[in-house]
């Protein structure tokens, strides 16, 4: 049983994808066409859109931020916060930009794609909260443009966060995937790296993934929140 592996582990790494967020009511990014007024969301969440179509760019992210104001982290996030304190969770690598991990009190989050909950000026670097976009004020006092602190299409991932995620994956005894299809590179390399370095690999996802065949445990029949709550309950026995 994987609960034994969790109890014995010295380093547990958690990897979360869109499925973790959708259980809290966050629309999957690629299903958020209602925000885009007929445009492809990937086209609006791009470096080109930020440079050439700022009105639509700001409108897209403002609507996304409005959605997140009505969302609360589900109980699975609380379990991860508990595991950070009571088990040896060394990192939570996430593909999500919604900030739900941080809102739930998760401390060791590595956001591969940044956070929509943070803004900064591209000219002077001044940081702002989301109120600037909510109030449709995307201009800094210096005159620069204020953007979300997310990785846009056309931009590279943060090399420092990638390096940390890789190191934690190498050192993991147990690597848990929660709600990721594991098809997006380079993020999908981390569970493979962990497995190659001896970690137990647990995959919890609604659908099958390309790495199911190398996983030690695969769970397709439970919501992520329920899986985490039930696993935590079993660990208390």
From Swiss-Prot:
Q: Where does Zn(2+) bind?
A: 121, 124, 140, 142
> Which GO cellular component terms, listed alphabetically, does the Swiss-Prot or TrEMBL entry include?
cytoplasm
GO molecular function terms here?
histone deacetylase activity, NAD-dependent; NAD+ binding; zinc ion binding
Q: Which UniProt keywords apply?
A: Cytoplasm, Metal-binding, NAD, Transferase, Zinc
Instruction: Please write the reaction equations for the catalytic activity of this protein.
Output: N(6)-acetyl-L-lysyl-[protein] + NAD(+) + H2O = 2''-O-acetyl-ADP-D-ribose + nicotinamide + L-lysyl-[protein]
The record ties this protein, via Gene3D superfamilies, to: SIR2/SIRT2 'Small Domain, TPP-binding domain
Q: How is the cofactor bound?
A: Binds 1 zinc ion per subunit.
Q: What is its EC number?
A: 2.3.1.286
- Superkingdom, according to UniProt? Bacteria
Protein name, please?
A: NAD-dependent protein deacetylase
Its ancestry begins with:
Bacteria, Bacillati, Bacillota, Bacilli, Bacillales
């Amino acid at each position: 049983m994987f609960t034994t592996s969790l109890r014995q582990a010295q380093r547990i790494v958690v990897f979360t994808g869109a499925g973790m967020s959708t259980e809290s009511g966050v629309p999957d990014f690629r299903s958020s066409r209602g925000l885009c007024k007929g445009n492809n969301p990937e086209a609006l969440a791009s470096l080109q859109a930020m440079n050439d179509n700022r009105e639509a760019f700001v409108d897209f992210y403002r609507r996304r931020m409005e959605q997140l104001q009505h969302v609360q982290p589900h109980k699975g996030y609380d379990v991860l916060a508990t595991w950070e304190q009571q088990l040896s969770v060394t990192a939570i690598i996430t593909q999500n930009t919604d900030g739900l991990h941080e809102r739930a009190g998760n401390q060791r989050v590595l956001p591969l794609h940044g956070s929509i909950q943070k803004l900064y000026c591209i000219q002077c670097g001044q940081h702002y909260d989301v109120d600037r976009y909510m109030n449709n004020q995307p201009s800094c006092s210096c005159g620069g443009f204020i953007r979300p602190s997310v990785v846009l299409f056309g931009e590279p991932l943060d090399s420092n966060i990638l390096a940390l995620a890789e190191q934690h994956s190498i050192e993991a005894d147990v690597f848990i995937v929660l709600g990721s299809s594991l098809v997006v590179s380079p993020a999908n390399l981390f569970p493979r790296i962990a497995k190659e370095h001896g970690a137990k690999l647990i995959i919890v996802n609604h659908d099958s993934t390309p790495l199911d065949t190398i996983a030690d445990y695969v769970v397709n029949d439970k919501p992520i929140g329920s899986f985490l709550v039930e696993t935590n309950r079993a660990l208390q026995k």
